[in-house]
A protein has these predicted regions:
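Beta-strand-rich binding/interaction modules
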Residues: 435-455
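Well-ordered alpha-helical segments within folded domains of soluble proteins
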Residues: 66-84, 93, 121-138, 195-212, ...
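Structural helix-adjacent loops and short alpha-helical linkers that scaffold large soluble proteins
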Residues: 82-97, 136-150, 211-225, 257-270, ...
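C-terminal beta-rich recognition modules with glycine/proline-rich loops and embedded aromatic residues
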Residues: 269, 323-429, 464, 484-578
Length: 578
């Protein structure tokens, strides 16, 4: 079993490929199957339970915990995304949208009108409302929604022009070691009611940028620029910014780059994503809730953001390291935190700060935010099934799905089936092709060994360029492309060097992170060899060690806080518990 470091080497990519962007296929042309579809369906069903129905979803200021618009916006967003990914009509979304105007204030946004100060959590919550409404409009094209989007943008965000430049970013002024799973207003400085979720105002920035993308309203540009400039001045690590808010802001930067054509914003997002990878990502690719606060908990909202951001940075750079990172986030973090009811919950953060190598449940379900964002996360996984760039089709992830690429009046349809990530076989059946000759681009992940490719059972030479496989050919209906490869177990250094010991390591089988559910602490050597067996465990040939993947499909036992410990950090000597 090899020992390697997981290091993204991106310097050649940051400046060289800034103008390249590949685009995902439309939801209408993607039908996912298998475990991903089941995850989407369970999340969709959860978002249609009573808590999220029209008579319950609209909250007072007190009920929301001073987060006006947050629950409503995230719920609309989750339902819109789940609906597109599953191709099912939401049961209650129309009624929610019909009732929405009744719950807006006299200025057309959620929460009270505060004439004398800026309310950070109100801007964040209404930012989610903007995101939900924008995605609803893009999906339905219902023009009346534009008036609500415009009122929120004009009467709440535009009203704050000049205030964003003085948003308090001095670490010495901010209360940096407080906060619960749901943030709260913790202090007032310089005309700002500030949240313990430090930096959540920039969640609103992402919503405003998407509103601008749709409205194309020039008056919003100075406000967006003011918010962007202030975000770029924040020392995320020193101020201990919330990772979810910071990653959402970075997604906003990429969105703004796509709108403006200014690739500087991609570069700035990339720099901050690297900071997050070093100081904000846990040992199984979840997140510390705040930068540098290693004794806290994770939040699937940020996991969703990190997954989306990794793929979006790949779109702009074509750096395959981002694809590998996205795979590990998906299987070991996003899937890990989806609970038995389809919602999403928080985990602990194994490492030195909490003195444990064990991954465990912290909160069964973050029903107030992460369950809804999980809908967007899973839907983006479906959307990212395939991408196109000047006629080249990229299939960056292996999924069970049917998808179609349409170019003018011509198209090609594939049915993809695979046993990955447990096995190394992927098959693409061509249902029909009127495009003629085309180029397909598959990933050649670093964990894929002895790759072979065949068409209709006849093996062909693999055209591997770096970590991509390219196939340029003319396909007809019923043709079959097959990929075969071997997956191996690999040792990797810890993700966060500040919160782990130098002798500790992580184990992977392909993208799947391995763990021990044994009652006793497991010790491993760097050269320990593990092989998968039919019972789902990985066994060592020369010891009684057996491990499993932390990935699960909504395991009903992973629910109660502290009841299902999995060892994910391994070392040669036993860790002394204090």
């Amino acid at each position: 079993m090899r020992f390697r470091s997981f290091i993204l080497c991106l310097c050649p990519f940051i400046m060289g490929y800034g103008n390249i962007q590949v685009s995902p296929l439309a939801f209408d042309d993607i039908y996912v199957k298998g475990e991903l579809l089941k995850r989407l369906e369970y999340n969709f069903m959860r978002l249609e339970e009573e808590k999220y129905q029209p008579h319950k979803v609209f909250l007072t200021m007190q009920q929301s915990g001073d987060w006006p618009g947050d629950t409503e916006g995230r719920t609309i967003l989750g339902l819109v995304m789940d609906a597109q990914a599953t191709h099912r009509t939401p049961r209650y979304l129309k009624d929610i949208m019909t009732l929405l105007p009744e719950h807006l204030n006299e200025n057309g946004y959620m929460g009270p009108v505060f004439p004398d100060f800026m309310h950070e959590q109100q801007l964040a919550g209404n930012g989610w409302l903007l995101r939900g409404l924008c995605e609803y409009y893009l999906w339905t094209q219902e023009e009346w929604v534009l008036d609500i989007i415009r009122n929120i943008a004009d009467n709440l965000f535009l009203k704050g022009k000049g205030c964003y430049a003085r948003y308090p970013i001095n670490p010495k002024e901010r209360k940096r070691n407080i906060g619960a799973e749901s943030g709260n207003i913790s202090q007032t400085i310089n005309g700002w009611k500030l949240s313990s979720d430090i930096g959540c105002v920039f969640i609103g920035m992402d919503g405003l940028i998407q509103a601008y993308e749709i409205l194309k309203q020039a008056s919003l540009v100075p406000v967006i620029d003011e918010m962007v400039n202030r975000f770029l001045q924040v020392d995320l690590l020193e101020i201990k910014a919330q990772t979810h808010a910071s990653l959402t802001a970075c997604r906003g930067l990429i969105r703004y780059a796509d709108i403006s054509g200014n690739q500087r914003y991609v570069n700035e997002a990339e720099k901050r994503f690297h900071l997050y990878m070093e100081y904000g990502m846990t040992e199984n690719y979840e997140n510390y809730n705040w930068f540098g606060r290693y004794d806290t908990w994770t939040e699937p909202c940020a996991i969703v953001d990190s997954y989306m951001l990794a793929v979006q940075l790949w779109q702009h750079t074509l750096n395959p390291d981002y694809l590998e990172l996205a795979e590990k986030i998906y299987y070991n973090a996003l899937c890990r935190t989806q609970r038995r009811n389809g919602g999403f919950g928080c985990d602990n953060c194994p490492g030195l700060a909490i003195k444990t190598p064990y991954l465990n449940v912290h909160t069964p379900e973050a029903h107030w935010c992460c369950t809804m964002r999980g809908g967007e996360g899973l839907s983006r996984v479906a959307e990212y099934t395939a991408f196109v760039d000047n006629g080249k089709i990229y299939i960056p992830f292996f999924r069970n799905a049917e998808f179609k690429y349409v170019s003018g009046f011509r198209s090609i349809t594939f049915v993809e089936s695979t046993d990955y990530p447990w096995g190394g076989k992927v098959k693409f059946l061509v249902k029909g092709n009127s495009l003629g000759k085309l180029t397909l681009c598959f990933p050649a992940y670093s964990w894929m060994k002895r790759i072979r490719m065949s068409i209709n059972g006849k093996e062909i030479a693999c055209n591997q360029q770096g970590r991509y496989l390219q196939l340029n050919t003319r396909l007809k209906a019923q043709d079959e492309i097959e990929l075969h490869f071997v997956l191996e177990t690999v040792c990797q250094r810890p993700v966060n060097r500040q919160n782990t010991r130098p002798d500790e390591m992580l184990l992977f089988y392909g993208p799947l992170q391995l763990c021990s559910d044994s009652d006793s602490h497991i010790l491993l050597q760097n050269d320990t060899k593990l092989a998968p067996q039919s019972d789902g465990y990985f066994y060592s040939d020369d010891s009684d060690v057996h491990l499993k993947s932390i990935y699960h499909l909504m395991n009903p036992h992973i629910w109660e806080s502290g009841k299902t410990p999995f060892q994910i950090l391994f070392s040669k000597k036993k860790i002394r518990q204090e």
